[in-house]
Regions:
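Intrinsically disordered, low-complexity Pro/Gly/Ser/Thr-rich segments with frequent PxxP/GP/PP motifs
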Residues: 1-9, 89-126
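Short Gly/aromatic-enriched secondary-structure transition segments
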Residues: 24-29
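Surface-exposed ligand/attachment interfaces on beta-rich extracellular proteins
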Residues: 15-19, 33-64, 77-81, 119-126
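A short linear-motif detector with a strong N-terminal bias
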Residues: 1-6, 49-50, 61-63, 85-86
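Short, surface-exposed beta-strand/strand-loop-strand elements in extracellular ectodomains
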Residues: 75-95
Length: 126
């Protein structure tokens, strides 16, 4: 389970090449002090540079953001991808994988991380 609770808590991907990477993140916000305590959301990010990219922003004040799904698909060629939890001060490395073209790094709540090949078959599990 990945939960963001602080005003600066974000999930970032660090990529080592300019090959295209399509990223989808879905989550649920828990705001117990409101009439609608659970609000789902999603973010889609296209990465096309060797860079550090925030793929999930910090939650609003008094909100816990539970990550449900992360998918990062290497569309344009091989790319080494590092997943980081960043609290505004320190980057905590979660994992690093090298994706071949067409492969997808996937996180699913309660299942953890895996890599899928270009056909969608599970390749590895961390």
């Amino acid at each position: 389970m990945i939960i963001l609770t602080g005003a600066a808590d974000v999930i970032r991907l660090v990529t080592t090449s300019a090959n295209a990477l399509d990223v989808h993140v879905s989550w649920v916000d828990n705001q117990t002090a409101t009439a609608t305590p659970y609000t789902p959301g999603r973010t889609n990010t296209a990465i096309a540079a060797a860079a550090t990219t925030t793929v999930l922003a910090a939650p609003a004040p008094s909100t816990q953001r539970q990550v449900k799904k992360v998918m990062a698909c290497a569309r344009g060629g091989a790319n080494t991808v590092t997943v980081e939890f960043f609290d505004g001060t320190t980057a905590f490395r979660q994992l690093q994988v090298t994706l071949a073209s067409g492969e997808t790094l996937e996180y699913e709540d309660l299942c953890g991380w895996s890599v899928r090949d270009a056909t969608g078959a599970a390749k590895t599990t961390n």
